[in-house]
């Protein structure tokens, strides 16, 4: 139902044409699951300004892709805040860290959530609330855990991982 993944942008490849980015994404990004490729670019990564993309698909609908790349660790942290707000108030929104894209989530009912992304082409989707939020939490956890494991001397995402654990507990209590 949901596919969520994180890609890290290769700093040695300049993105000049968004129209070819999707078809050539492997030239510009490394999949977080590909540890050997990640390790091969470790020396050129700027861990204070880590660019990448979060890929989110619901069935066949693309909600986020490589064309919305940004500071990926910050974006994941922002998404965790949105999830926390949705669980607390039914609504959460954020702007991307380094570009003027607004992302929002609103509870439509106990079991539905409206996901909106004000990108060049506006994305709107009503998604199963529980499954979507859980998939996002798991996607964030995978990203932060994998980064901590792979780049132990360069990053420390323990605060984000603690927040994920807190969200899991709140999630299980609220939904």
Residue spans for each PLM region:
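N-terminal "first-domain core" detector
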Residues: 1-56
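Charged, low-complexity, helix/coiled-coil-prone segments
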Residues: 9-28, 72-86, 152-159
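Short linear motifs in intrinsically disordered
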Residues: 37-48, 82-84, 102-107
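A short, charged
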Residues: 43, 90-96, 100-101, 148-162
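Aromatic- and glycine-enriched beta-alpha-beta binding-site module
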Residues: 49-95
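An exposed acidic His-Trp-rich patch
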Residues: 78, 85, 89-132
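Mixed-charge, glycine-accented linear interaction segment located at domain edges/termini
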Residues: 122-175
């Amino acid at each position: 139902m949901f596919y969520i993944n994180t890609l890290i942008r290769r700093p040695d490849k300049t993105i000049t044409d968004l129209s070819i980015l999707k078809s050539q994404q492997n030239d510009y990004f490394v999949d977080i699951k590909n540890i050997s490729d990640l390790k091969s670019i470790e020396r050129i990564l700027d861990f204070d300004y880590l660019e990448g993309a979060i890929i989110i698909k619901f069935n066949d609908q693309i909600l986020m892709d490589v064309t919305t790349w940004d500071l990926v660790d910050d974006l994941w942290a922002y998404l965790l805040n949105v999830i926390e707000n949705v669980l607390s108030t039914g609504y959460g929104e954020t702007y991307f860290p380094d570009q003027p894209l607004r992302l929002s989530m609103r509870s439509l009912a106990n079991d539905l959530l409206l996901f909106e992304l004000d990108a060049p082409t506006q994305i709107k989707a009503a998604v199963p609330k529980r499954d979507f939020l859980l998939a996002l939490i798991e996607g964030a956890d995978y990203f932060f855990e994998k980064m901590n494991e792979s780049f132990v001397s360069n990053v420390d995402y323990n605060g984000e991982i603690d927040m994920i654990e807190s969200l899991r507990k709140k999630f299980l209590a609220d939904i």
